Amino acid sequence: MRHGISCRKFSRPTAHRLSMLANPAVSLIRHERIVTTVAKAKDLRPFVERLVTVGRRLAKKDPVRGRRLLLSKMGGDLDAVNKLLDVLAKRYARRPGGYTRILKNGFRAGDCAPIAIMEFVDRKEGEPKKVAEG
């Protein structure tokens, strides 16, 4: 019986599954919005929420320890860790949780897998990127 098991295995070994969580987490932190399958988004949400909470709590108390802990969880991506500690930790300083949302977005063309958009709550909509002419 699978009582109390909170995560999916995705038919992958543990190391692959952990890197499969770390890579989209880094992309989500960098771009603040990603497109993925619904199952992966539901598994990614608690992982990212914990990262933001750790960054939020340790940004002021012990920034060196927080930076090292986040680097180990996020595959050593320093740019994403810096953004998490400098931008996202300040943005969600007074928010007790619930930093992400999952919006269902139809089905993938190739295999009809349900697709979702995962994004941070309270994110600023950026200016549209200008296309270089010429």
Swiss-Prot record:
Matching Gene3D superfamilies: Ribosomal protein L17 (3.90.1030.10)
Signal peptide positions on this chain: none
Short name of one Pfam family: Ribosomal_L17
S-S pairs: none
InterPro entries assigned: Ribosomal_bL17, Ribosomal_bL17_CS, Ribosomal_bL17_sf
Swiss-Prot/TrEMBL keywords: Ribonucleoprotein, Ribosomal protein
One GO BP annotation of this record: translation
A Gene Ontology cellular-component term: cytosolic large ribosomal subunit
Keyword Iron: no
SUPFAM superfamilies: Prokaryotic ribosomal protein L17
UniProt keyword Electron transport, yes or no: no
Similarity annotation: Belongs to the bacterial ribosomal protein bL17 family.
Subunit structure: Part of the 50S ribosomal subunit. Contacts protein L32.
Name of this chain's protein: Large ribosomal subunit protein bL17
Organism in which the protein naturally occurs: Anaplasma marginale (strain St. Maries)
Gene: rplQ
